[in-house]
């Protein structure tokens, strides 16, 4: 504010002075009203006088500016200091946890594989009618049936064909059913005399087409009329007739023989419930004993730690633990009947005698205390331990109550659960604020990177037995690893589970409050003592809280199916010590335990994720092995790993670092292939030629000659340049030729007038116009290819001259015999033989597959007040 120069307007009249006085009074009143607002507001305002005729010298201006600068600096320093000190005072509400609904939904939407119902048989082939041509190229009236590919997408090029077979294998793995019930897919045979059924709609349509074909023998027609199912009710078995290519039959017969369904009975359901929940006296379980004999289930695949994602997969492990944390947060029960926040704060104020005090540090004890924060803290602690998520502590050193609450936290939660830096900071604050001042010891100067924590150093220096004993317990507070039901569990110390450790903590706190704090002022000592008093007044409730925390953690832990590996996570869950204070101060005497429905839901979600995880590992391992055995040297393994992660649903694959992707690939390579997947691959591998020859898209090679060769008659095409075998020709593998780039051998053979056969998958191109074929000299095409050494552009021309060609009669009339310097090598497709294609498939007549085994269990709990912990004493004893 600018200063007025004294005596500047003494000659002004009295009336004017009176008016000025009134204005000043009004200004002061308004200033008083706005003062509180201005102090609390964060806006920086420049306060100036009203515009009056006041003369100010340059010197006064300079001095005013300097004073203003100094004042601003003081205010800024004070403001920053206040921000630091009053952080928790100003923060009246603590941010609550917002569950990521998308991740939770992704986890809960993972269902067992049996949700995929098989409605038809697996088929690669289908029979098709092909024309027959006479010796002169004319088409006959009769047709022949041959097996062709249902979905003919075979590419050209040996490598691409092998890649096609890998994709086919992937498709089979995707469609491979866990169980087959033929009765569900059977359809009526239209040509049956007694309304019999065949196995599926495609078999029925094939039978219909063959029955209507004029070429079909009478015996075959009579057989089709007799085709029907054969039921053996006493054995719960039914046989259905089917028409399948031998390879398709091999696939479907394998699926039928290797179904994953197993008989379901009450013992299986009983053993499916986690043992600790079965044996927990707080849960009353009843089972429906009316299971039919046809009940079936699919045993979940719960193999452990095949990839060890906790080891060197930081990003993946962080995502898994985050998902588990979000799931656990959603099922931890809410605290009930907490102490009224207002009543508790009022009582604490009375204990602190705040009316008679103006010590700011003690008013901080009450900040941030609310029931929402208490509930939030309870859920965070249990969920973090269940998911093994690392926590970080948020606190202000000047709030002694937070630090005293932190002492309870460090007593009951193992050190491993906190990130090292946060644990050290909290322990150092407790040591330098409470423990060392109590005994008059100098501040601990902690060196960053010291292998020992502040509590470990303090344990060696403190002479007081009770305090040193408590420090020793905290320093050695680690999870105990135990394998229960085949799952690695992180178990709490028995002293924590029973709540006895709280007495140890209270003894240490009482010893600290009795100390003299010789180097500190009286107010400081009194503040610490009153903070300890507030906590010690709730000894019974703290014991109960510790028992309640341990019971809920262990009960929910029984529903975890994957090993609880403990590794520090990349990201942490923040925990504010004011929320710990809220929990300690507001916990009531109402027991909360998870409801049976919540437990079963948590267990089912864990089982489904774990089972899906193992099945996707099996798929990825099978695909990687298949790619290696098919010699797919260009195949990017990273793509297989990415696909594997996508099928687990919870990962953002694009954000996973490459080094972890390749490490994952290496781990997947070391795993053995699951037996069913291996057998299926061997079926494909043994029948690659059969599948390839059924394609109309590709030929198996080409014969190149220097001189023209006559076109030959073929029943399937007429006059064509097709060779049905390679006898008498020297063979060269086309893929190896293209990879080596050495074409000298071909050139020399052609110049010596020796035809050469290039063996490999080539496009099977047809052009029916003879005129256009004559215009294309394939000899010059191939000469150019050999000359330029671009065999990968090889596209042999198929001459096909028959009565379907536009120029058939032109050729016939002039008695012209066409020739070609190339012959396309094409294997003969397999002919359809009804007798060899008719197979009987056998399955159970009927059974019911149950996906949710726990639906048979009706469960209830005892009254929460009567709930007991592992020591057969009530969880909450304080009433």
Curated annotation (Swiss-Prot):
Site (Interaction with the intermediate capsid protein VP6): 219, 223, 227, 838, 840
Cell compartments where the protein resides: Virion
Superkingdom: Viruses
One Pfam family hit: Rota_VP2
Span list, region Hydrophobic: 393-413, 421-441
Modification after translation, per record: Sumoylated with SUMO1 and SUMO2. Sumoylation of viral proteins seems to have a positive role on viral replication.
Region ranges (Disordered): 1-35
GO molecular function: RNA binding
Residue spans of biased composition, Basic and acidic residues class: 19-30
Record's subunit section: Homodecamer; each decamer is made up of two conformers of VP2, called VP2A and VP2B. Interacts with a VP1-VP3 complex. Interacts with the intermediate capsid protein VP6. Interacts with NSP5. Interacts (via N-terminus) with NSP2.
Entry remark concerning the domains of this protein: The N-terminus binds RNA. It is necessary for encapsidation of VP1 and VP3. The N-termini of 10 VP2 molecules form a cylindrical hub underneath each 5-fold axis of the inner capsid.
Protein purpose: Inner capsid protein that self-assembles to form an icosahedral capsid with a T=2 symmetry, which consists of 120 copies of VP2, with channels at each of its five-fold vertices. This capsid constitutes the innermost concentric layer of the viral mature particle. It encapsidates the polymerase VP1, the capping enzyme VP3 and the genomic dsRNA, thereby defining the core.
Cross-referenced HAMAP family: Rota_VP2, Rota_VP2_A
Protein family membership: Belongs to the rotavirus VP2 family.
Protein name, entry field: Inner capsid protein VP2
Organism: Rotavirus A (strain RVA/Human/United States/DS-1/1976/G2P1B[4])
């Amino acid at each position: 504010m600018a200063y007025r120069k004294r005596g500047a307007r003494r000659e002004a009249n009295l009336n004017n002075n009176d008016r000025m006085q009134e204005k000043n009074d009004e200004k002061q009143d308004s200033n008083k009203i706005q003062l509180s607002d201005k102090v609390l507001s964060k806006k920086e305002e420049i306060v100036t006088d009203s515009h009056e005729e006041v003369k100010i010298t340059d010197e006064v201006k300079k001095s005013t500016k300097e004073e203003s600068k100094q004042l601003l600096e003081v205010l800024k320093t004070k403001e920053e200091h206040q921000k630091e000190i009053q952080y928790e005072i100003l923060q009246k509400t603590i941010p609550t946890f917002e569950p990521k609904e998308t991740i939770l939904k992704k986890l809960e939407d993972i269902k067992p594989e049996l949700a995929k119902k098989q409605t038809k048989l697996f088929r690669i082939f289908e029979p098709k009618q092909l024309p027959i041509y006479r010796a002169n190229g004319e088409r006959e009236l009769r047709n022949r049936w041959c097996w062709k590919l249902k979905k003919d997408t075979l590419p050209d090029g040996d490598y691409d064909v092998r890649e096609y077979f890998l994709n086919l294998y992937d498709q089979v793995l995707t469609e491979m059913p866990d169980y087959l019930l033929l009765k569900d897919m059977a359809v009526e045979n239209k040509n049956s005399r007694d309304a019999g059924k065949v196995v599926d709609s495609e078999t029925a349509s094939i039978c219909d087409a063959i029955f209507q074909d004029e070429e079909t023998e009478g015996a075959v027609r009579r057989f089709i009329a007799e085709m029907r199912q054969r039921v053996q009710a006493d054995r719960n078995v039914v046989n259905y007739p089917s028409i399948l290519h031998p390879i398709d039959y091999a696939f479907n017969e394998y699926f039928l023989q290797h179904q994953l369904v197993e008989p379901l009975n009450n013992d299986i359901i009983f053993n499916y419930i986690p043992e600790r929940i079965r044996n927990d006296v707080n849960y009353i379980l009843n089972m429906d004993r009316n299971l039919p004999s046809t009940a079936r289930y699919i045993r979940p695949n719960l193999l452990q730690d095949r990839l060890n994602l906790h080891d060197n997969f930081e990003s993946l492990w962080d995502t898994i633990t985050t998902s588990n944390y979000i799931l656990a947060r959603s099922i931890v029960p809410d605290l009930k009947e907490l102490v009224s926040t207002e009543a508790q704060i009022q009582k604490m104020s009375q204990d602190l005698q705040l009316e008679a005090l103006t010590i700011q540090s003690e008013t901080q004890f009450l900040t941030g205390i609310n029931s929402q924060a208490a509930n939030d803290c309870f859920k965070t602690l249990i969920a973090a331990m269940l998911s093994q998520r690392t926590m970080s502590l948020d606190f202000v050193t000047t709030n002694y109550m937070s630090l005293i609450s932190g002492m309870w936290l460090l007593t009951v939660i193992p050190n491993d659960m906190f990130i090292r830096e946060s644990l050290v900071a909290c322990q150092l604050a407790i040591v330098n604020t409470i423990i060392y001042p109590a005994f008059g010891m100098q501040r601990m100067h902690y060196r960053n990177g010291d292998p020992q924590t502040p509590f470990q150093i303090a344990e060696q220096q403190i002479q007081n037995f009770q305090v040193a004993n408590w420090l020793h317990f905290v320093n050695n507070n680690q999870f105990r690893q135990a394998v229960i039901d085949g799952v690695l569990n992180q178990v709490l110390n028995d002293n924590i589970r029973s709540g006895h450790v709280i007495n140890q903590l209270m003894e240490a706190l009482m010893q600290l409050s009795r100390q003299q704090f010789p180097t500190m002022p009286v107010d400081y000592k009194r503040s610490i003592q009153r903070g300890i008093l507030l906590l010690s007044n709730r000894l019974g409730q703290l014991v109960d809280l510790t028992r309640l925390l341990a019971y809920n953690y262990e009960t929910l832990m029984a529903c975890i199916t994957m090993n609880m590996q403990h590794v520090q996570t990349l990201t942490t869950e923040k925990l504010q010590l004011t929320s710990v204070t809220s929990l300690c101060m507001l916990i009531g005497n109402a027991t909360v335990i998870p409801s049976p429905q919540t437990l079963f839901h948590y267990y089912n979600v864990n089982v489904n994720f774990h089972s899906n995880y193992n099945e996707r590992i099996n798929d990825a391992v099978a695909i990687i092995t298949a790619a290696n055995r098919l010699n797919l040297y260009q195949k990017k393994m990273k793509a297989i790993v990415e696909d594997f992660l996508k099928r687990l649903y919870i990962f953002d694959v694009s954000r996973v670092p490459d080094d972890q992707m390749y490490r994952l690939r290496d781990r997947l390579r070391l795993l053995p292939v699951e037996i069913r997947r291996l057998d299926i691959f061997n079926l494909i591998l043994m029948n690659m030629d059969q599948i390839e020859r059924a394609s109309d898209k590709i030929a198996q090679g080409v014969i190149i000659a220097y001189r023209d060769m006559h076109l030959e008659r073929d029943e399937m095409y007429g006059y064509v340049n097709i060779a049905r075998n390679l006898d008498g020709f020297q063979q060269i593998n086309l893929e190896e030729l293209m990879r080596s780039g050495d074409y000298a051998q071909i050139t020399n053979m052609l110049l010596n007038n020796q035809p050469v056969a290039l063996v490999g998958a080539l496009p099977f191109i047809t052009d029916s116009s003879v005129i256009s074929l004559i215009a294309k000299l394939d000899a010059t095409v191939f000469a150019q290819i050999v000359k330029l050494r671009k065999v990968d552009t090889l596209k042999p021309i198929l001459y096909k001259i028959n009565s379907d060609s536009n120029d058939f009669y032109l050729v016939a009339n002039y008695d012209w015999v066409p020739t070609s310097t190339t012959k396309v090598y094409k294997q003969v497709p397999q002919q359809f033989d009804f007798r060899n294609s008719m197979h009987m498939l056998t399955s159970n007549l009927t059974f019911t597959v149950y996906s949710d085994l726990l639906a048979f269990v009706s469960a209830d709990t005892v009254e929460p007040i009567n709930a007991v912990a592992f020591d057969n004493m009530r969880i909450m004893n304080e009433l």
